[in-house]
Structures are given as C-alpha cells and as structure tokens.
Amino acid sequence: MIVFRKKLGSGLYIRKFDRYINADTSGDHSSDNDDPSRLEGYLDNSWSSEGSITQVNRSNTITELDTHVICGMFKPDVSGTWQFRLRCDDAGYLWIGSNAESLEWDLNKSNALCDGGGGHPASNADGSISLTAGVYYAIKAMVGDRGGGDAFIIDFSGP
C-alpha cells in the first residue's frame, strides 16, 4: 500500500507527557507492556505552546522516555476507505473515531487502527477504515521514545 503525505487541517494539537508508554525501557522490548494508563499525571503543562498544527512530522523532537500525543478531528472530503500510516520509533498507536475519544491514559491499544507497539527502529504501522465525507472523526496518535532516535509521522490517503 502506498500512502501519500498530505497536510492535515488545523484543529490538531500536541500534548507531551514526561513518561514513556512502557515500563520496560530496555532494547527492543515487546509491546505487551505498552500501557497508555502510565501517562496519567505526567502531562507537561508548561510545554505545549505550539497551538494547533497543520501536519504531523515530529521526527527528532521527542525527548528520550517521553511520549507525544496528537489529538484533534479528521473530516474526510470523500466517502470510502481511507488508508492511514503511522511511522514511529518506538511504541506508536493511532486511533480514529469513537476509539480516539478517550483521554490519553484511557485509550485501548487493542482497538488502535495502526499498531506499532514495542521498542524498535523507525517502522510503519498501517491501517484502513471506511469514513463518510463531511463527518468529523476524532483522531489521536501516540508515540513514545525509549532512546536511540525517534520518529512520529502520520500519512493518509483517501479512496
């Protein structure tokens, strides 16, 4: 599947948490212990002064053992199956629709559209979902860095 990068509409914003999503910060750990509930109470309130963002390419910006979360709304211009790609290093997840409406620490990784969990070098996690034109859908993506570089890119394409 080829997914082309597009600019996202305003209304997306970023939140930074001073904690890694997984208690295991060793090498290429598995995603078994990736746990969004670890983020509760670790929101960095003094950090997010960027306001809304219009594209997601957060590579080389995540501090080691931090987690960044992109939140907002996605409004497709065409009905049909949309492809999403999350490029992440390390643990990363992307949710669309009602699965994305929870607070970050209440998200369920088992219903993520894109699942790039665990410790690993930059890699892609792909997913597709049927969306209706003109409807607003919640979108949330989370990437944590355990060290050794980072990547956080969201790409998408419509039908």
Describe every region a protein language model picked out.
Residues K6-P159:
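Acidic/polar, compositionally biased interaction segments
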